[in-house]
């Protein structure tokens, strides 16, 4: 049987004439019904596409990442059980290639979101209680690379692959943990959700967010993101959902991470 191509609606054109499995939104737990069902899989796309391919592939997986999610080189897939995020053990890709042609055409919003994702991989692990000498060195390398705000999408994807290697060493912590309820409850994209806490976290850690991100853009995104949260959903309920993710406790913030601390980070 021919290879199965796992793609998104925007990357399906690169698999013309092939058998395809199209990932249209965040990955449901239902994907486990076809775990290890295909001998050879090729993935072209971002994190959700590659996470799906890692679950489906049985023998060989070739990945062409188009964002900086780093999923090709991590050892788990993110799946959703309703509004709850779960990490499912999965394989790493056998081959990872960055094709410049597949990386063109990303919207400015997707470019920004994927930059946020790899930045969060570096920050979450750099300040993790589980960080090692090796992981800290890689975190710092990624942050230095990201100081180039004008790098091409293909270069950003390469940096994202380093981020995948990083989170295979040390699990993500604060930013990722806080983002999951925003994605699960309101369908706010992963990178967008994390961007809301960047300025507050950088202020707390005495880091200059302007080194990596445009201040005006961050401010406007926070305003837009707050508008996506329904008024009838109380802040206390949202904070309760955020605090359920134990991984946030591994972040070395200097004091206990409480609802009040999270409110300050998000400017709520």
Predicted regions, residues:
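Glycine/threonine-rich beta-strand-loop-alpha-helix active-site module
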Residues: 30-103
